């Protein structure tokens, strides 16, 4: 047995170790044959011989298991070395990827409002008439409901035309106070130099109990936001109309391209339209069961902001995957 123990200690791999185990404990192994011979021995002799065999088996197993564990660890280390990444193969001159300008612009917008303790709310892309139109105070005759402008399914569901339905879902699920933005994709049947069938919006909503929220609050909040996005620009509010806000306004900033001198982008007005806003219409509160509350809402197109931030003249180029354009935003 001592000879086998010495062979075990000299083993350098698991295959050799297994060969030794078979020669001792295999079907024709030396100890196996010894146990087979016990059948023909008398009781006293059998007892004594069996004790010796069991002692030798225990010594062998102890040596075998210790060596097996050592060799298994060595084999594992070798496999880990073979599977390890060789960082010498990586070429540092290779350029890395980067966020698409639309996504980086959306991230910048979201980060701003998160810092002001706004929540991020999400909703389904496929909406129903109530959440997308009716609860937002859009009458049946409103042109946005027309098949020419909205993607409808056969079951009268539709692809949402704005992220405003998320505001309705949030108000139905929560009580004031609410400070939220709803970023996401929206869909309209439009495709030209400034419109695509799918684009991204960020809409915001602030609702407080009582009559605490005024247009002055809205104006101050949006002026700070627009200067955060575009730097030291002038901001102006123009009266407008949206079914879900009253009063409503469209917001312009001084042209970031020509600095109010007049150019093709601003149509020689010196101003660029960037978003819409207003005080939430009381009819909207009636649809969600709110009473004695006040608030404001606003909405912007992320692609529009990306175009202005990065001076991209054609909106469609953002979705064409042209590497010559996208490589500029690494």
From Swiss-Prot:
Keywords: Aminoacyl-tRNA synthetase, ATP-binding, Cytoplasm, Ligase, Magnesium, Metal-binding, Nucleotide-binding, Protein biosynthesis. GO terms for biological process: phenylalanyl-tRNA aminoacylation. Its cofactor is Mg(2+). It comes from the Bacteria. It is an enzyme of class 6 (ligase). InterPro entries: aa-tRNA-synth_II, aa-tRNA-synth_II/BPL/LPL, Phe-tRNA-synth_IIc_asu, Phe-tRNA_ligase_II_N, Phe_tRNA_ligase_alpha1_bac, Phenylalanyl-tRNA_Synthase, tRNA-bd_arm. Tetramer of two alpha and two beta subunits. NCBIfam families: pheS. This is Phenylalanine--tRNA ligase alpha subunit.
